[in-house]
């Protein structure tokens, strides 16, 4: 057997790729490494100079993504020169690569000039038909989890003056680059759709909360929107109350309706919410479906399971 200290991620494990997958299971296709930026694959095992050729030696046939093109290519060449990648292993990988290309008729497409579809095909992205489909699907999945105090329906007649509290997410790291999120656009869309529905919306974020009694006189209800999202670089995504005005002190002062536009398990951070819904997505069609259902213009058709309560008794109340 293998000692625990010698266990490697699958991409670097010949006992899995070569012995089990290609040997015992008879897999005759192409094996591509995990993305070489992934910490689970390359973070804490052996130096990258050994990882790069080691992945091919272990049985992978293609290597996905560079850290540095020149350096990684040098690591691969050195692995071939020093025998880490044998001639037999190299030829096997090449045969599998060529075999996949042939199976996909890439040589024919190249000859015919049809490897890439025409740019005109991009015109369908964001077309009216796709937005219509998005709206139809959103109508089916927006879910009401609880409304213990019967705050709904949320109508202008009942709650004309809405205090909007918007909690956004973090920037995203994609292909090694930090990209800014689109929280401001999502927030602006929520405000626009609420105003179109007849509400007066206050989305200001003052430094101080101010007096409770004044808050209750100014607003009929609070709509707390959670659009918390990230990408891969975080192990856990939680609500971050970055300003006092956003912290959920208002839930016992005025009717507060909470809706998550992303993760469905946000009750772990707002267990005190009496009314909570999941919209799952933060695009305009999902926001529209959410508002329509909160207002009682459309029924909630989505379903939830016990995971939304995060295994905690207090989230159910």
Regions found by a protein language model. Give the residues of each.
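Active-site-proximal beta-alpha loop/turn segments in soluble metabolic enzymes
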Residues: 1-8, 118-124
